[in-house]
Structure formats: C-alpha cells, structure tokens
Amino acid sequence: MNLPAIAEEDTIVRLGQNRSHRRLLGDLLHPERESQVALDELKASMGSMEFAAQYQQTPVPIGGNLIKWSWFKSYDTPPTPQSGDEIIVSWDTALSSSQLADYSACVVLLARGETIYIVDVLRARLEYPDLKRAVLEQHNRWRDVASNYALLIEKKGSGLSLIQDLYREGIYAIAVDPNGDKIMRMAAQTAPIEAGAVHVPTHAPWLDEFKKELLSFPFSKHDDQIDALSQALQRAFAPGMPRGILGGY
C-alpha cells in the first residue's frame, strides 16, 4: 500500500471488505502530526529527492533508473527555427479522463539534424472533446513554426478516434503503431540521449513533473510523457527520415 504524506493525486484507499477512504490531491496523511507547514520545512531541509523517498514513498535514484538526468543538455532560450528544422508534436492519449486513469500527454520537439530540443510538454486528464481541442490547439500553435512538421498520435483507444476525426477536418496525423513494450521503446532511444543529443529547458512550468516521471521510469505510476517522448524520438532519430513529408495540414 502506497500512502504518501501528501497525496499526489486523487486515490481510493481500500481499508477492507466494503470499506474504503478517498484521498484527494494535496490531502495530508496525518495533519495532526505533520502539518503542511511542517512538511514544507522538512522538504526544504531534506531536499526533494530524500523527501520523496521517505515521506512520499516514491524513491527515485539521484541519477535516474533507465535514464540519467545528467545525460540531457540544457538551454536557457528556445532555439530559433532554421531552414531544415522539423517540429514533432507527439501524443499519447488516455482512454478516460477519470481521476484514477492515465494522463494524455503531448511532447513537442524541435529536431535539427541529430540535435533535439524538447520545447513543450502538456499533460492532463481530458474528456474526448477537450482532448481533441487540446490536440487542435497544439497543432495550430506549432505547425508553422518550422519549415517541416509532423503530428504523431499513437493508434490506440481515443488516439484512433482522433486520427479519424482530424482526417475528416483535413489534418493528416501520423498513426503510430508502437512495437514492443514501453521499456523497450524508451530503451531504444537512450543512446542519443546519453550522447548529449537531447536538450531540455533550464526552466519550464512542466519541467518538474516531466523530470520526476522520467527519472522514476520504468517504476513510475504514470508513463504517458515517456510514451510521447519515445514516440517523438523514434521519428527524430529514424535513419534517413525525410523531414516534413508526413503529418500535414
């Protein structure tokens, strides 16, 4: 049983036959013993890694599991698109928006030859109409940024419906049928990451959650951002991949 000091999402804790307790995001496990102020002070004094291991029951190796954070290079200012660059918008969509379900995640890359910049990440639980709206917003935001563009959507569940709906609106997404399991797909992309080919921003509103999921993988509870990332990197590093041929308007 996983009972973090501060609930990281809405959960239902089974207490026995026909008994359960609902914990909401941010609920404290023992507020009488450890208040939010006390826990914040502990986190500040211990550091987030040790606090996560001791109080949140989510130990993350300092360097990471499958992927080390030290492999990534960082950038302060987003790269200015150049001729030949490609924007890759990669979606891993959930089957449901239930508070206990997986997230839908979108990872946006700027690919410049063998150098990759992660420029945006979106992660949310969305009903299908809101999911489609989010896909269209990301598409409209990024499709004209670089000379080449690809929209990737995993061909499963709500992703299949999205691909069909977008096609009817004249938007041609690349339907990705993944091979192998999640670990194999991400492991196949670790070599270029370790070689320093992938860059992340120094600061971004999505960076902390992205880093946490990345370093916890493959033992993290959620891996939607990982799936979207590995899918995007597979295209970015595919041998002889022509830029801008697929995933159009």
Identify the residue ranges that each predicted region occupies:
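Signature of the SF2 helicase/ATPase Hel1-core->accessory helical subdomain module
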Residues: 1-11
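Flexible loop/turn segments at secondary-structure boundaries
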Residues: 9-10, 62-63, 96-98, 115-116, ...
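ATPase catalytic-site recognition across NTP-hydrolyzing enzymes
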Residues: 16-93
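C-terminal nuclease/phosphodiesterase catalytic domains that cleave nucleic-acid phosphodiester bonds
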Residues: 49, 53-58, 97-101, 107, ...
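Gly/Thr-rich phosphate-binding beta-strand-loop-beta motif of the actin/hexokinase/Hsp70
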Residues: 79-111, 228
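Short, glycine/acidic-enriched loop or turn micro-motifs at the edges of active sites
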Residues: 93-95, 123, 157
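Nucleic-acid-processing active sites and adjacent nucleic-acid-binding tracks
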Residues: 107-153
